[in-house]
Every structure is written in C-alpha cells, then in structure tokens.
Curated annotation (Swiss-Prot):
Annotated localization: Cellular thylakoid membrane
Signal sequence interval, chain numbering: none
Recorded GO CC terms: plasma membrane-derived thylakoid membrane
EC category: translocase
PROSITE patterns per the UniProt record, alphabetical: COMPLEX1_49K (PS00535)
Catalysed reactions listed for this entry: a plastoquinone + NADH + (n+1) H(+)(in) = a plastoquinol + NAD(+) + n H(+)(out); a plastoquinone + NADPH + (n+1) H(+)(in) = a plastoquinol + NADP(+) + n H(+)(out)
Family statement: Belongs to the complex I 49 kDa subunit family.
Organism whose genome encodes this protein: Synechococcus sp. (strain WH7803)
Membrane protein topology class: Peripheral membrane protein
Origin: domain of life: Bacteria
Name recorded for this polypeptide: NAD(P)H-quinone oxidoreductase subunit H
Gene3D superfamilies in UniProt: Cytochrome-c3 Hydrogenase, chain B
Main localisation: membrane
HAMAP family: NDH1_NuoD
Amino acid sequence: MTQLETRTEPMVVNFGPHHPSMHGVLRLVVTLDGEDVVDCEPVIGYLHRGMEKIAENRTNVMFVPYVSRMDYAAGMFYEAVVVNAPEKLADIPVPKRASYIRVLMLELNRIANHLLWLGPFLADVGAQTPFFYIFREREMIYDLWEAATGQRLINNNYFRIGGVAADLPWGWLEKCRDFCDWFGPKIDEYEKLITNNPIFRRRIEGLGVIGKEEAINWSLSGPMLRASGVPWDLRKVDHYECYDDFDWDVAWEKEGDCFARYRVRIEEMRQSLKILRQACDMIPGGPTENVEARRMAEGKDSEFAGFDYQYVAKKVAPTFKIPNGELYTRLESGKGEIGIFIQGNNDVTPWRFKIRAADSNNLQILPHILKGHKVADIMAILGSIDVIMGSVDR
C-alpha cells in the first residue's frame, strides 16, 4: 500500500487590518506551513496622518493638542517630549513644582498604559475577565486627569514650554494618595489571579524569546528591552525632570519571553506607585498647600513667590521663536523610548520635527520572533509587544 504524500505548499494568510487582536489597523501577511509560521510581513501605514509635517507647520502650543492622538494610551508622554525639545534647545528652565507635577502625570500615564496593555493581552490569550478589572482602575486615573486638566483620556493639552498649563487643584494630591492606597492591593490581586495561573503560564512561557544581544541589536526599548536582561531605563540614564529625587528601582527580567515582559510591566506599576507617593509628599509648596492662595495672601515677599514654587517658568509668547540649532531629546514612556529630533531656524515653527515612536521600533522584530511558532501564538507574541498603530504610523 502506497503512503499518501500529505505535505502541501505554504499558504499565505492575511491577518487584519480589521481584526480584533491586531491592536489597531495592522495587517500581517503570514506564510504558514501547516500551523507553523514560516514568514511574516507587517504592513503598516493605514493610520498615517502626517504628524511630523503638521508639527512643522504649527507653533509648539498649537501642536501639543495633536500629540495625544498618536498614542492615545500615552498622551502625557508625547506632550512631555514635545515641550522638552524646544525647552532644551532654548535653554528654558522648569520650576521644581512644575517638574513634580509633570512626574505625577507621567507616572499616572505609565500605570494607565500598562493597564490598557494588560487587559487586551490577557483577552488575546483567552482570559476575558481582567479586561473589565483594568478599566475600573483606569477610571480613577481618568478622574485625576479630569480634575487637573479638564480632559480624561486624550487631548489633555496640559504640558507647556517651561512648565504646565495650570497648578493642581486643591485636594488633588490627597485624591492621588487615595488612588495609590487603592491600587496597590489591586496589583496583588492581579498577581494572585494571573501570575501563578498554570494555564496562563503554560500559554505564554517560552514564547517569543528575545536574547540580550538581539534586543540591543534590534534597538528595542522599554519593557521589551528590560525583559531581555538589559536594565536600561531613561529615567535613570538621562536624569530628566526630577526622577533623581525619588527612591525607586528599574524593573527587569532575564528570560526575554512573553511572561518576562508581563512581569516587567507588573513591577513597573509598583515602582510608579512608589514614585507617586514620594512626589505627593515632596512636591515644593507642601503636600496639602494651595500655593497660589498662600502666595496671594502673603504678598510678593512670600517664599511661595519663588521660582521653584511656580507651575510655569514664564508663559511663552505665541511669537516664541525656536532658536537655530538641532537637538534630540527622549524620555521613557510605558512602551519604551520616545524621542524628538528638532531643528530650529529662528522661526515660530520648527524646520524639522522628527518623531521616534517606541512601539514603531519594537514592532520591527515581530517577523524575526514569530518564525517557528504556531499560528495560535501570533496573537500572544504581538500582544506582548504593546503597539498602538496611531504612533507606529504617525
């Protein structure tokens, strides 16, 4: 009896651009041999809106409201780096109080980013319930943002050259502390439900392994890099804002797989809580002071009229001209390094404005780590990268 030859030609399958697990309008052209992934070609650009060219035709204050539409899970990070670039180029100082307020907003955004990663990632691997839990906590962060900026998810439009748009309202720091007290036990709850769940562990351990040298050579950043054994965090490396004032640790793992990336993000949320608590206690002007009221009551000789107690160094005029020169500035977002290359031409608009998105770089390694895995593992590996197509395509 002759044996039938069952081997077939490789099959090309399209995932996306409209697929629930694509995390936006991403299209993957996957070549399969049975259930094994032979090749993968990401097709991007469906959400390209020309953000860099828009920036080159707007003043800085005009462009800030645009940036949270790139990565709607990291709007504060993009606002921060967009104002940091002209600040450093023009050597504009930032008051200590404004720097602390910025750190508070950035760390809240880091937690919100990781929560919005955690829920869909677990849904991708088959756990639907945590998706509802994470929005319970995010709702409290939205409330804090709304109290300080007037907006909840995107278009906070809060960062300004030299500081922030407005001081924190009275009682905001107490509400932020309440959130920290509430959210700490919730992380423990997530760990009990997820981390040692045998089904979850067997589903993602050993998937999408990236070695230390690979991670560096592919220019990965953020949790993708730190999960591969490289404790590189720009908050420690570049010493920007006032992060050196706080006691916190860099979260990192050695395994380099999907589970390690999950562990890094969980630990980063704990470290963000440590920073938030310290910032609430150490902010210049006191933790419960209404600085503006004290300044007005005590007159111009009040200590609260000093530079470090301001929320903005000097309101930049609409005719503020970006000086000649070029500069690259960067910061650590929830997804990794986001950076701005700015080239000034002594004009109100920049001559060149290049945006480096963290998830855009991290996505490039996807075809490399997918090869040899099963088709069912595509969603888990892609989900562990944490991409938002608005910032990938820009």
